[in-house]
Amino acid sequence: MLIIAALYLALNAALLTFGKALIISQIEKNLYAKASLEKVTFGLPLSINIDKLSIEGLFKADSVLVSPSIMGFLAGRIILNSLKIARPEITLTRDKDDKFNLPRIESKGKAPPILLAGLKIQDGKLIFLDKKIDPDGYRVVVNDINVDIAKVAFPPTSLYTNFKASAIFVNGASSPAGKAIASGWIDFGPKDMDGKFELKDVEAVVLSPYYQNIIPAKKLHSGKLNFIADLKAKNNDLLVKCHLEFSDIVYGKEEGEGKNSVSDLFSDALGIFSDASGRVTFDFSFNTKLDKPRVDLINLKGTIAQAAAQNIASQPPENVIEKVKETAKKFKEFGKSLKDIFKKEE
């Protein structure tokens, strides 16, 4: 026991003396970003604790705990039994050229792969600034990020991994604006998967620029977004089945807008696709690869358009005819009012 205690004290002394400078220098050397941390300590049975880690413009966390595997080290592999990150805050930026502020890690020589057996994120935060959508940076904030990813312990060679995650969207008033949830399992050996991703009761305005081809973002005042993606993979072939639903959509009127305004027309046009309860739903699916997932946007737009057509086809014909007639009438009245305005100006 005395030997273990002495070794523990020696390791902590070494980390306090050299660990901080070593970790900072490695981060700055590999990520090309300014880094800082408060202290580094050694814990039992075997863990390295980093307090107040910060990487300029990208990441900061109250604490990072790393538990390496001794057996993996003896086998010549870098295996982390667990990585726990408490209260991380990530700032992700996309520029006008669709490039992100993620650092490029240059591989020098053939470095051994790092295998992660477990990851836990507690009370995280993501700030996404999208300068491709808005030159000033459209801001999406996600709070209360909690992630739990764990590889099964037996058999040791298995790559079967369970995962679950949750997060809360935040609106412009810093209030909760919906929830994101993910759960399931993935086996990296045969490349199989069974999982689900959900957006529940998200305020439609929060993500409005990303579906403005469906709902005009500038006119959207309020509404709810729900989305479910069922992900199933077998031998690397991944099928994603999606259900997208908008409800309680309300368009705000700009100053001076009255009856048969542009806002009303947007609402009526969208209403053609809605069911009896006023919900607009799209059911669609696409195929990709589990190890290299990609989405063909052109094909996806076509798939969504087909889903919209099916949505109309599933409604009673008399309902659709009545909706189209009413909307066409309002467009005609709106066009007449524009014509009258231009006549007055002449």
Label for each model-derived stretch:
Residues M1-Y32, P317-F331:
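N-terminal type II signal-anchor transmembrane helix
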Residues M1, W185, L220, K224, ...:
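Extended terminal
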Residues I105-Y211, F286-T288, P293, I298-E318:
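Elongated, acidic membrane-bridging lipid-handling scaffolds
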Residues A33, E56-P68, D95-D97, I105, ...:
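Amphipathic hydrophobic-ligand
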Residues G43, S69-F73, T93, V152, ...:
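Short beta-strand micro-motifs enriched in acidic
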Residues R87, F169, D201, F246-D248:
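Transmembrane beta-strands of outer-membrane beta-barrel pores
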Residues T41-D98, I105-D130, K232:
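Flexible beta-edge/linker motif
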